[in-house]
């Protein structure tokens, strides 16, 4: 099956168009071979396949493929008809009414019904999917059918991608190591008083010992990677608005995983008095009442750490001599709503991360990524001395945004770093604890960032998740500093005492 559009519609006329029947017939015949083929390969333009006249209308059926789509074709015809009928016959075109709009899209996999505006019905048919749209003149002019088609094709491509096994490719793996420690590090840390659960799901309070480990990881990243490679520290916002996520592309699918932010409708104390009074009397927080008094979500808590940075450079032009731009942020927590039950520090809703971002030409971005890979290998082999591997994967946004072709070229994509967790057993699932992503022109285009020379800008990012580093290191080395690699132990120094309780 090929992509097919079928539109049944009519032009509303100011008078009976019958006197102009011959002129209309000639116009449609001519348009099928000229007007409706412009911009399309030979034989792939749109066509008027049927038409008839009514007292106050010109009814027609249009068919097309991917080129000169029917909703574009009908506006081309409107302009020609208005000129032809207006001059000679004094008949005006008052608007367009749509009777049916059907798109047939080739697909190898069935899809669930899309629950979005303007879709009247969706059916899985032999060889593809059939959509019936409920659109009018305004929606066609605003290219709503194109956006619906793009959404559907992205979902088809993502379904095909999900059926493949090739989106995880092993690049390198360290030789197997002996791991005497076999405990779950989270349980061991809790038992030794290194950390306790916070009051919110997926949240931990880190004691002095755990905090020392985190700060040592940060120091290693600063001294062994960020400073030698010339990265400058910034502070990124941790409340992210819809505007940012729309530009970054996250607005296409982030909703199940973010913590939403809703501001008060007003700061007027009188407006909130009944909430405060309710608590004073009942000693319960009236969450339903609060829900009535807060505004709609303005965005959410930091999810992926780098998008807010891009508002700093949005709409700007970078001088040639200023690239590559290399920055990092370690100023606060990120938040991600994790599914399932209770997890350890390897899977949390609130976590600490150093986010590394770089911008430059394609060649510069690829070079920066290689530099990071080299420094990470040094850290994981020579300082932490862990058993790990790295694999090339395709990130979620590419499957979601129809960018899989770029990933297959092996330039745009993500390299995941994974480590074994001995307590899970020899056949247990490895944990992804680090990544390096090359995002192509996704962010510079989304935030309208340009280069003085006019050359295309690319970007990359890499997140250092401190909880994941701790989960991996402590799972393999345990909590006893005597069993840690000497290089790491020297950087930690004397471990602080924990807080004692009776």
Curated annotation (Swiss-Prot):
Disulfide bonds: none annotated. Mg(2+) 1 binds at residues 336, 338. PROSITE patterns: AA_TRNA_LIGASE_II. Zn(2+) binds at residues 306, 355, 461. SUPFAM superfamilies: Class II aaRS and biotin synthetases. Changing residue 306 to A: Loss of activity. NCBIfam families: PRK00960.1 (NF002120). This is Type-2 serine--tRNA ligase. The keyword Protein biosynthesis applies. Mg(2+) 2 binds at residues 416, 432, 435. Its cofactor is Zn(2+); Mg(2+). Pfam families: tRNA_bind_4 (PF18490). Binds 1 Zn(2+) ion per subunit. This ion is coordinated with 2 cysteines, 1 glutamate and a water molecule that dissociates from the zinc ion to allow the coordination of the amino group of the serine substrate, which is essential for catalysis. Keywords: Aminoacyl-tRNA synthetase, ATP-binding, Cytoplasm, Ligase, Magnesium, Metal-binding, Nucleotide-binding, Protein biosynthesis, Zinc. One of its GO terms (biological process) is seryl-tRNA aminoacylation. Consists of two distinct domains, a catalytic core and a N-terminal extension that is presumably involved in tRNA binding. It comes from Methanosarcina barkeri (strain Fusaro / DSM 804). It catalyses: tRNA(Ser) + L-serine + ATP = L-seryl-tRNA(Ser) + AMP + diphosphate + H(+); tRNA(Sec) + L-serine + ATP = L-seryl-tRNA(Sec) + AMP + diphosphate + H(+). ATP binds at residues 336-338, 347-348, 432, 468. Belongs to the class-II aminoacyl-tRNA synthetase family. Type-2 seryl-tRNA synthetase subfamily. It is an enzyme of class 6 (ligase). GO terms for cellular component: cytoplasm.
């Amino acid at each position: 099956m090929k992509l097919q559009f079928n539109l049944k519609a009519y032009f509303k006329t100011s008078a009976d168009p019958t006197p102009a029947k011959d002129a209309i017939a000639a116009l449609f015949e001519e348009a099928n071979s000229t007007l409706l083929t412009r911009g399309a390969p030979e034989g792939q333009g749109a066509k008027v396949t049927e038409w008839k006249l009514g007292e106050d209308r010109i009814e027609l059926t249009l068919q097309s493929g991917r080129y000169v789509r029917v909703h574009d074709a009908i506006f081309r015809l409107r302009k020609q008809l208005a000129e032809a009928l207006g001059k000679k016959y004094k008949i005006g075109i008052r608007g367009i009414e749509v009777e049916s709009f059907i798109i047939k899209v080739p697909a190898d996999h069935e899809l669930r019904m899309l629950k979005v505006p303007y879709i009247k019905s969706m059916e899985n048919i032999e060889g593809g999917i059939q959509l019936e749209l409920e659109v009018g003149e305004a929606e066609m002019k605003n290219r709503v059918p194109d956006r619906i088609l793009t959404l559907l094709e992205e979902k088809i491509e993502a379904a095909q991608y999900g059926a493949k096994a090739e989106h995880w490719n092993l690049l390198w793996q360290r030789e197997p190591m002996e791991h005497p420690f076999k405990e779950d590090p989270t349980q061991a840390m809790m038992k030794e008083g290194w950390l306790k659960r916070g009051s919110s799901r997926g949240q931990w309070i880190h004691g002095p010992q755990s905090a020392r480990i985190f700060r040592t990881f940060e120091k290693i990243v600063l001294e062994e990677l960020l400073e030698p490679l010339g990265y400058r520290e910034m502070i990124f916002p941790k409340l992210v608005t819809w505007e940012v996520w729309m530009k970054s592309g996250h607005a296409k699918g982030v909703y199940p995983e973010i913590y939403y932010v809703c501001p008060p409708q007003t700061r007027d104390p009188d407006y909130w008095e009944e909430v405060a009074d309710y608590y004073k009397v009942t000693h319960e927080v009236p969450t339903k009442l609060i829900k009535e008094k807060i505004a709609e979500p303005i965005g959410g808590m930091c999810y992926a750490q780098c998008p807010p940075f891009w508002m700093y450079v949005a709409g700007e032009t970078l001088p040639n001599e200023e690239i590559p731009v290399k920055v990092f942020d370690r100023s606060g927590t990120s938040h991600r709503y994790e599914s399932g039950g209770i997890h350890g520090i390897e899977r949390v809703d609130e976590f600490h991360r150093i986010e590394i971002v770089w911008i430059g030409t394609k060649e510069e971005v690829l070079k920066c990524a290689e530099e990071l890979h080299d420094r990470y290998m040094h850290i994981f082999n020579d300082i932490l001395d862990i058993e790990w591997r790295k694999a090339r994967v395709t990130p979620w946004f590419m499957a979601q945004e129809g960018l899989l072709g770029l990933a297959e070229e092996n330039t745009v994509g993500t390299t995941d770093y994974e480590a074994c967790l001995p307590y899970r057993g020899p056949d247990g699932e490895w944990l992804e604890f680090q990544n390096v992503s090359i995002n192509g022109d996704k962010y510079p285009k989304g935030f309208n960032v340009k280069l003085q020379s006019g050359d295309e800008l690319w970007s990359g990012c890499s997140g250092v998740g401190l909880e994941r580093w701790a989960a991996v290191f402590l799972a393999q080395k345990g909590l006893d500093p005597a069993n840690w690699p000497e290089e790491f132990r020297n950087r930690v120094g004397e471990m602080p005492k924990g807080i004692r309780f009776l």
